[in-house]
């Protein structure tokens, strides 16, 4: 597993606006901290509203938003198959959005 990998998520029933159901997630944890039993993941959504801090990327031919404001530490048991990897501009847009939501700009 590497930073930028897109994996299937097995999420529990969420509360309120927490993500749930079948979706993908982007590994945003540093490669220096992998592998671990818990990994930082940004979930994705094809139906989330547009926002300046939600980068839109292509995953398996479908445009999807990376919900960087909902990054979570997930046990690796909640991670399914590796389906893709974000490279170049797509990963840069995730990094830039993470900087914005974490106040690192």
What role is predicted for each listed range?
Residues 1-105:
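Conserved functional hotspots at enzyme active or ligand-binding sites that engage polyanionic ligands
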